Regions:
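Substrate-binding groove of N-acetylhexosamine-processing glycoside hydrolases
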Residues: 1-260
Length: 260
């Protein structure tokens, strides 16, 4: 921030920040005091995750939009990344996308139920599955298990962090087997709520993506349980089947490039 005054007067800085407590207020005040046009860039909280970090994204979006207005920013730039492989289900983007539009348009906060209704209506053109609510509920997994890792979900970290000893030490310091089991049960309830509901084509594709994200998260939490129990070789899931499901979900929306 102290270097903001060194920027050319034609520069238009973008203040990036993705956590619920990112200091947009302080940073915006510094940049605005230099007389520069600027924007704030919150995030969807979806990357490096299988279910998103919806509560963090919600708070991050609210802070960005409110501080953009407070400090006279040109607006907000919603960011969604594919860091480390784009493993997130596409549908986890929708709540953040619609909520950022709501906040930028009139600045009014929304509770989750009307936002879920908006996702159902505007994205899926149907409320049969109430998929908007299920997406946001799955996005609470990290809060459910008491994890507050910055810029990633614990479930994603359990599957993709190669430093196993570091992961185990993190679990032993910050997690318990009970929390891991609670997280697995939490995800199972979402699956049960979705099962048997009628759906249209858009809902069906998004539901498949979400269920795959939930399955990957469950696999990860089971891996966490194994690490906590001292049995890291335990691997009960069917890896080839999961890879086939992931390939199918990927190719339903994207080109093959990046899949391998």
């Amino acid at each position: 921030p102290e270097n903001a005054s060194l920027l050319a007067p034609t520069a238009e800085p973008i203040i990036w920040g993705y956590e619920a407590d990112h200091p947009f207020d302080v940073q915006s005040e510094v940049v605005a005091s230099c007389g520069l046009s600027f924007r704030l860039a919150p995030g969807t909280g979806t990357w490096r995750s299988f279910t998103s970090r919806w509560p963090d994204a919600r708070a991050n979006l609210e802070s960005a939009s409110e501080n953009a207005l407070k400090h006279g920013a040109e607006g907000i730039l919603l960011t969604t990344w594919g860091d480390c492989g784009n493993h997130q289900p596409w549908c986890t983007l929708y709540p953040s996308l619609l909520y950022s539009a709501q906040l930028a348009w009139n600045g009014t906060r929304l509770d989750d139920p009307p936002l879920a209704d908006a996702v159902n209506c505007m994205v899926f053109r149907s409320s049969h599955m109430n998929l908007g609510a299920a997406i946001m509920e799955a996005g609470r997994l990290d809060r459910q298990i008491g994890s507050r890792l910055p810029n990633r979900s614990l479930a994603w970290n359990l599957l993709f962090e190669e430093r196993r000893d570091e992961v185990r030490r993190h679990l032993e310091k910050n997690q318990t087997a009970r929390r891991m089991r609670d997280g697995i049960d939490f995800l199972s309830r979402i699956v049960e709520e979705l099962s048997g509901r009628n759906s249209n084509r858009k809902e069906s594709l998004a539901a498949e993506e979400l269920l795959l994200g939930i399955e990957l998260s469950s696999i990860a939490l089971n891996k966490g349980l194994a690490l906590l129990s001292g049995n890291p070789q335990q691997d009960p899931h069917d890896t080839p089947q999961i890879l086939r499901k992931y390939e199918k979900a990927w190719l339903a929306r994207a080109r093959p490039g990046g899949l391998e």
